[in-house]
Amino acid sequence: MNEPKLISGNANLTLAKSIARRMSVHRGMAVSLVDARVERFNDQEIFVEVYENVRGEDMYVIQPTSNPANDNLMELLIIADALRRSSADRITAVIPYFGYARQDRRAKARTPISAKLVANLIVEAGIDRVLTLDLHAAQIQGFFDIPVDNLYSAPVFALDIEHHFKGQLQDLMVVSPDVGGVARAREIAKRINAPLAIVDKRREKPGEIAEMTVIGNVAGKKCIIVDDICDTAGTLCKAAEVLIENGAVEVHSYITHGVLSGPAVERVTKSVMKSLVITDSIEPSAAVRGAPNIRIVPTAPMFAQAILNIWSGTSVSSLFETDTLVPIYEGMYQRG
């Protein structure tokens, strides 16, 4: 069986290189990115040229479709087309952050279901499988006519919480920032054996919060807000304020995808939150890396193992278990 081969667009080269390094550690052999050129013509058309022979190879395209979402999506599709026309045997799109996932349904009349359209485009480009992380809506997996492996941040976040709050777990309260995110927050609460609270928000219009109410007693607790996406951070920072007003002694947040657009970083640094923990599913900007209360949990170990499991035909769902991730993260976290 040929070794898996990785190729990357421009969306998150740092993560792609980290995945290659981690796979090298796991496999005991050198894994590097396939040599390719992904460029723009003067009119901003995307051009891809693969410099290595990929005929009959098992290819993994690492490309989150984050900001600029349209450019990064087109890069993914064109890379896949180049690989298919170069006779690659199988193409897996590794999409750490799946853009357009928030458009998974018609919220009002005469609007699109853009997530379904993107799924159709991915399939038509010749991609055989998708590997992603914390889809905004789990039902998006059903939009595809190809297999989709959706990894979860909950196991590694639970490990991180156990590590950073060692000896304080009894003081923690996991908080969902809205009713729709309860299942996600409950999963982490169950893993760390903590109670659950909910912030019920009433939204007047997108981007504007009219009212927030805390469901649950957070007095004297160190609150851990759990969500999948932080965009402008307005809702998150307001939720942190409301929790403090309701008696919480500290507020920390664990968010899978740090979109952090516009004034988000400034809001977070000035907020009452002691820390915001995100993954590197989206390439962190210099401002994000320099923020004193933002910390980044790497996803490369998890993606590297998932790719190896797909390649070898072994279980990907084994990565949903916290204990499985301990050796994968190589001493970064210790249990007990």
Curated annotation (Swiss-Prot):
InterPro entries: PRib_PP_synth_CS, Pribosyltran_N, PRibTrfase_dom, PRTase-like, Rib-P_diPkinase, Rib-P_diPkinase_bac. Pathway: Metabolic intermediate biosynthesis; 5-phospho-alpha-D-ribose 1-diphosphate biosynthesis; 5-phospho-alpha-D-ribose 1-diphosphate from D-ribose 5-phosphate (route I): step 1/1. It is an enzyme of class 2 (transferase). The keyword Transferase applies. Its cofactor is Mg(2+). The active site is at K201. GO terms for cellular component: cytoplasm; ribose phosphate diphosphokinase complex. Coiled coil: none annotated. PROSITE patterns: PRPP_SYNTHASE. Its EC number is 2.7.6.1. Keywords: ATP-binding, Cytoplasm, Kinase, Magnesium, Metal-binding, Nucleotide biosynthesis, Nucleotide-binding, Transferase. Mg(2+) 2 binds at D178. CDD domains: PRTases_typeI (cd06223). It catalyses: D-ribose 5-phosphate + ATP = 5-phospho-alpha-D-ribose 1-diphosphate + AMP + H(+). It is found in: Cytoplasm. Pfam families: Pribosyltran, Pribosyltran_N. D-ribose 5-phosphate binds at R203, D227, D231, T232, A233, G234, T235. ATP binds at D43, Q44, E45, R102, Q103. Binds 2 Mg(2+) ions per subunit. PANTHER family: RIBOSE-PHOSPHATE DIPHOSPHOKINASE FAMILY MEMBER (PTHR10210), RIBOSE-PHOSPHATE PYROPHOSPHOKINASE 1, CHLOROPLASTIC (PTHR10210:SF41). Homohexamer. Involved in the biosynthesis of the central metabolite phospho-alpha-D-ribosyl-1-pyrophosphate (PRPP) via the transfer of pyrophosphoryl group from ATP to 1-hydroxyl of ribose-5-phosphate (Rib-5-P). NCBIfam families: PRK01259.1, ribP_PPkin. Belongs to the ribose-phosphate pyrophosphokinase family. Class I subfamily. This is Ribose-phosphate pyrophosphokinase. It comes from Cereibacter sphaeroides (strain KD131 / KCTC 12085). The gene is prs.
